Amino acid sequence: GATLRITRLRPSGRGADVWDELHPTAAQQVQLYDWLVARGDGILTGDSFFHLSGLGQPGALAGLNLCGAGRVVCLIDPVGDVYACPFAIHDRFLAGNILADSGFQNVWQNSKLFRELREPQSAGACGSCDHYDGCRGGCMAAKFFTGLPLDGPDPECVQGYGEPALALERDKPKPSGDHSRSGGRKGPIPLKLLKLPPKKFCNESPV
């Protein structure tokens, strides 16, 4: 049968404008956790919901139990910039550029940022929490874009440590620039249209 992949709403990109209004309540987090555990491997979550692992037994929730940024995942944007995470598009998490830095392999293996992310991380403010081994402090991008310290609790910490941190005065980072780099070509971009009939109808038709 089919599987479903769901992704956590993070306060980055366009999500930054709606996160305060739309992110799940504590009760909804529990409901989501129970739903994910009940469906097991039929739901693909990647590392999106490891911050919920403190609600149950270790290993009950499918997927990684740590932030995969720079370890198992990264993002390459249309101009070749490599970021540690698809949800962390900011100069703070820019590892390099595949065009300027001798290709992706060099960036992935030798970037200073990626090497730092792969080192053992300090538990910081979460060091005294019994559930730290389960969630590893939560999502790096969620913390950064809500103005919380990277060694602090996830803003949606299921043990309740995120809410007091969010109540403090915070400096939310702004986008570090226009990553579209649209200042080059002016005018329309010519497209190459297919003049020969497609080999299969489904190659052209969305239905």
Q: Which residues are covered by each model-predicted region?
A:
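Radical SAM enzyme [4Fe-4S]-AdoMet core and its adjacent flexible, acidic
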Residues: 1-82, 87-96
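Flexible mid-to-C-terminal extensions adjoining Fe-S/redox cofactors in radical SAM and related proteins
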Residues: 87-207
